[in-house]
Swiss-Prot record:
InterPro entries for this protein: DNA_mismatch_repair_CS, DNA_mismatch_repair_MutL, DNA_mismatch_S5_2-like, HATPase_C_sf, MutL/Mlh/PMS, MutL/Mlh/Pms-like, MutL_C, MutL_C_dimsub
GO MF term (any one): ATP binding
Region (Disordered): 339-400
SUPFAM superfamilies: ATPase domain of HSP90 chaperone/DNA topoisomerase II/histidine kinase, DNA mismatch repair protein MutL, Ribosomal protein S5 domain 2-like
Name this polypeptide is given: DNA mismatch repair protein MutL
Keyword NAD: no
GO cellular component: mismatch repair complex
Function comment: This protein is involved in the repair of mismatches in DNA. It is required for dam-dependent methyl-directed DNA mismatch repair. May act as a 'molecular matchmaker', a protein that promotes the formation of a stable complex between two or more DNA-binding proteins in an ATP-dependent manner without itself being part of a final effector complex.
Gene3D superfamilies, per database record: 3.30.230.10, Histidine kinase-like ATPase, C-terminal domain, MutL, C-terminal domain, dimerisation subdomain, MutL, C-terminal domain, regulatory subdomain
Protein keywords: DNA damage, DNA repair
GO biological process: one example: mismatch repair
Statement: the UniProt record of this protein carries the keyword rRNA-binding: no
Amino acid sequence: MPIQVLPPQLANQIAAGEVVERPASVVKELVENSLDAGATRIDIDIERGGAKLIRIRDNGSGIKKDELALALARHATSKIASLDDLEAIISLGFRGEALASISSVARLTLTSRTAEQQEAWQAYAEGRDQAVTVKPAAHPVGTTLEVLDLFYNTPARRKFMRTEKTEFGHIDEVVRRIALARFDVTINLSHNGKVMRQYRAVAQDGQRERRLGTICGAAFLEHALAIEWQHGDLTLRGWVADPLHTTPALAEIQYCYVNGRMMRDRLINHAIRQACEDKLGADQQPAFVLYLEIDPHQVDVNVHPAKHEVRFHQSRLVHDFIYQGVLSVLQQQLDAPLAEKDDPPAPRPMPENRIAAGGNQFARPAEAREPATRFSITPSREPAASSGKPGGASWPHAQPGYQKQQGALYRQLLDTPTSPKPALQPPAAAELAGHSQSFGRVLTIVGGDCALLEREGGLALLSLTVAERWLRQAQLTPGAEAVCAQPLLIPLRLKVTEGEKQALAAAQPALAQLGIDVHTDALHVTVRAVPLPLRQQNLQILIPELIGYLAQQNAFDVGNIAQWMARNLTSEQTSWNMAQAIALLADVERLCPQLVRTPPGGLLQPVDLHSAMNALKDE
């Protein structure tokens, strides 16, 4: 077959495979377009879980008649125009793929009017060439998008849609996340003609807390500690639940936003988890709603098809900043009794971070503050007026754009001089608190496969290769239930000897617990499913080696087989970076807490700084 340019319809459907996963994906893309257009009210109408109808109506700036056809074309956008714009994304959308992708798998109608136009216009694409038809319509200033019969022309995709209740649940969660990101926008959600959610725009702090309680529940609001933490161009705001009152239901509330974009980032989650580790059990998770604002030049949002992940240029800096901000709030909550509302405010300096004091550039005294109220403990790195925004604290809101000349250069964070220590320090600050459920903080990567950690007042080297091996063993070892098996698209069929066949038959119960589904016949073995850690492996090599190992064993212990597989899996990482190391340690700390308490040989090696310093003095 010769190389040829794909037809527009086929190209758009391929792109839709990444952008349009389910009805909730459509809602997310279209609502983000409304927010980028400056809308202050968004109405979302859903029918049959989004399979029948998704209608998004806003009062934004609208689209000009001459641009309606372009709006439905691939890679057509008003968000960016040059490479410089791509390196500093401030809008939620920027690729120009959403409308074209959605229109290729559904019947999409776009109706819009700008303030300059006297009448509205409606556009829709149809036919194999996606030809756009534009005609007059009646509509106020703003835009309405109707998506009918999602996946009507791709039956395979439609077959994988879940029940109406499940799909609407995903839509409800997306709308909830967006409502938490933009307090200044009214969002109404209806399903099958019934109003399900009404999030009204709020401005004052008390109203924000009411909206927070509406979305996250009264239990979260009751134990929420407000954060406002700032250093240079980095700002962290939001709420974290008191770890001492965290319940499994509260732990489901983990919402994180980077420059107003909802995000799932393991680096941020690890920083928060590490800050709460002394107060959380091994099986507990923190609950939080946090907003991180950062120079757009220092974060890459163009790394995930659905823009769910970002990559920080200074990941260690961001990690330590978030860790310090959350930890300081939790320490204040423990060190200072809550004041009654009628009591006069008494200034009190914030204690230094006991774990990072002297070793973290963010650990320096804050300005005097008032005692916390019931809901908020808000240490601020700088006076509110220094942010240049009226009204002190700033919350998610519509911004006209990021100005490069505003704020100090991001790299000044690395050159921030150390603040002088206070004359009086709490006695407990002299001792460095240990990490009860953490290996410590990653300082740097050494040799490509080792992490240098700050741990229990000293330094240690951790082998990332060994840590990954232990993580795989934990993932492969069954607990109360067997490891979940992942079916292979094409089963693997191998020829075996009579001895290997007998060994496989004897080991079959153990293999089933490990998520390996094998079937034998006269001369062959067929592998139909493997556990998730094996999916990316070369099974043509690994499975014969596993069969050879089993043929040499007299007994088949599940733990021994899991250990053998963990040692023989091929690592995807040949050289680690900071973000990968932090994510790996977060998984190991969560799945293998026993390694933190009693590290096995080859995993952790203390670094003797005293001997090195004495050697330098002797010289």
